[in-house]
A protein has these predicted regions:
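Transmembrane-helix signature of 12-pass secondary carriers
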Residues: 1-563
């Protein structure tokens, strides 16, 4: 059995019949020599639709730290928030994300991308409005924090649902040559979300400087955090309609046509030819017969009869197609477990889930508790007026984001189709472990400039590494019919790691010290590099072709192929 052809070696398909595709489809011709990181207009449009969820995810992640500090002044007169409630607020979105990733991932495979896509964004909008309506003046301080935490769980369900949805929608439409680049571009919106969150904090605080600093109205910080949270509604509303009206992709429709196995070499070769072309969306199919009457001539009776027969055949085909889809839905749960009951598939799922879990223990452990880092570099806001403290924290967050966060994503975009996902993930884990080891071993000895440099490199190799590739891997390694479910499971395991960090970091750092916690993160990164060895390289690999060949091999082994 020959392995799947690399896209660069796929035979030309000059006689490909005309297809009618949605305005988001990018038809990739064999002679296209565009660099992988240069996107077409349609790919940029898809990037805008799918990327907003990750922008909102990072925006929410990085504003929760300054928001929590603002709530100290609004609710507790500048005293620290109760540790349990503070952890609940920070972990709330991640708790919801686990639910959303499981639920939306399975639903996207079962009901279809079109039926589900956009609902997660509606949930984000609804939860954001609920958050900014927190009645801090009517509830007790603890009651206000509980209100906020509950709405953040709902917000997390929507944000979590966006992971498998956007990954599947993009991968279903991606050209094989630029699939990793497109997914990396989408995920890079996390970098911009954190950057804009830090910048927005500074700008809003500057607008409130006279009120808080000169007039001494510290309680007005209540308006600052509500505006900061509410700004996320702008990109959410801006892309909602596009998501709700996005057609179903051809790749998904083809994958759900039933359980007919691939039984001949020609079918597999056709899949290989299509691997270079964007599968796109074929909702707008125009029959060739529609052109026969465009010149105003009368159709002969014999042709009319043939047309009637064609219409009847088309109706019968549509009926069979609907029956196939119904059968596919009915059997989806069984097929999913049957597919992952094989060790060759299960070990890949274990690899994607475990790597994402280990990454997020370290990544979110650092980024949900940036106050520890800001303290080391002198931007923790430990002195001065309330406004000065908040402004210092905002500047510190901006420095951290600009130095390592955004650059790491774009180095991945430029190199992912050259270096491959596996190499980037392993080196990212190992180099992140290196800088975690330096920070842990010299935590109290490093000068401020040295600490900033080490932390910037740590963030850089998180993002030019496992933080990006753990998102790409489940979308690229599993076939279309199981893609969203497997991606949702992998992402949920990652968020479980984030929850562990959010709830355990503060208490652990007080018991055993921050350097010891950083050594734990070091161990997570080393283990992540080891579990990456379970994963295949997916550059130039079409999982639907692999799945089709596996089906064909199964049929051949069991003697069901015609000889």
């Amino acid at each position: 059995m020959s392995p799947p052809a690399h896209p660069d070696s796929a035979p030309a398909n000059q006689d490909r019949p005309t297809t009618y595709k949605s305005n988001l489809e990018e038809y990739e011709r064999e002679g296209d020599v565009r660099l992988p990181f240069l996107l077409s207009y349609r790919e940029v449009k898809l990037l805008g639709i799918a990327g907003v969820g990750f922008f909102l995810d990072a925006y929410d992640l990085f504003i929760i730290n300054p928001v929590a500090t603002m709530l100290q002044y609004r609710l507790y007169g500048g005293e620290e928030l109760p540790p349990g409630l503070e952890g609940f607020i920070k972990a709330g979105a991640n708790i919801g994300s686990v639910i959303g990733q499981f639920a939306f991932g399975y639903s996207a495979d079962y009901f279809g991308r079109k039926a589900v896509y956009g609902k997660e964004l509606m949930l984000i909008i609804f939860a954001t409005i609920g958050t900014i309506c927190d009645p801090t003046g009517a509830l007790s301080p603890s009651g206000s924090l509980i209100w906020l935490a509950v709405w953040r769980i709902i917000l997390g369900i929507g944000i979590g649902g966006d992971y498998p949805m956007s990954a599947s929608v993009a991968t279903d439409r991606a050209n094989l040559r630029r699939r990793g680049t497109l997914l990396s571009y989408i995920f890079a919106n996390q970098g911009w979300g954190s950057f804009v969150g830090s910048l927005a904090t500074i700008i809003i605080l500057l607008c409130y400087k006279h009120t808080m600093e000169v007039d001494g109205k510290t309680s007005k910080v209540d308006g600052v955090w509500r505006i900061l949270v509410g700004l996320s509604l702008i990109p959410a509303f801006g892309t909602l309609y596009q998501r709700l009206t996005l057609p179903e992709s051809t790749r998904y429709v083809e994958s759900r046509k039933g359980n007919v196995p691939v039984a001949d070499e020609e079918s597999i070769e056709e899949l290989k030819k299509k691997a270079n072309a964007d599968p796109g969306v074929s909702e707008k199919v125009t029959p060739a017969s529609s052109e026969t009457e465009s010149d105003g001539t009368r159709t002969p009776p014999s042709e009319t009869a043939a047309t009637d027969e064609s219409a009847a055949a088309a109706a019968a085909a549509a009926k069979r197609h609907a029956a196939d889809l119904a059968a596919a839905k009915k059997n989806h749960f069984r097929e999913f477990f049957q597919y992952f009951s094989e060790w060759r598939h299960l070990k890949v799922l274990i690899g994607t889930c475990t790597c994402w879990f280990l990454l997020d223990v370290a990544f979110y452990g650092i980024n949900l508790n940036q106050n520890v880092v800001l303290q080391q570099i002198g931007f923790d806001g430990s002195s001065g007026s309330p406004w000065n403290r908040l402004f210092k924290i905002g500047i510190g967050n901006l420095i951290v984001t600009a130095l390592g966060f955004v650059p790491g994503y774009y180095v991945t975009i430029l190199t992912i189709e050259k270096l491959g996902r596996k190499w980037i993930q392993i080196q990212g884990f190992l180099l992140a472990a290196l800088f975690l080891g330096v920070l842990a071993g010299k935590f109290h000895e490093l000068s401020t400039p040295a600490f900033i440099v080490c932390f910037a490199f740590l963030q850089f190799f998180f993002n030019f590494g496992a933080n990006t590739t753990t998102y790409c891997y489940p979308a690229e390694v599993f076939p279309t019919r199981f893609r969203a479910s497997a991606h949702g499971m992998s992402a949920a395991c990652g968020k479980a790691g984030a929850i562990v960090s959010a709830l355990a970091f503060n208490s652990l750092s007080k018991k055993i010290g921050t350097p010891a916690v950083l050594w734990i993160f070091f161990g997570c990164c080393i283990a992540g590099a080891g579990f990456t060895l379970l994963l295949p390289e997916v550059r130039g690999r079409d999982p639907d072709i692999v799945y089709a060949e596996e089906q064909r091999e199964y049929e051949r082994t069991h003697g069901r192929l015609a000889h």
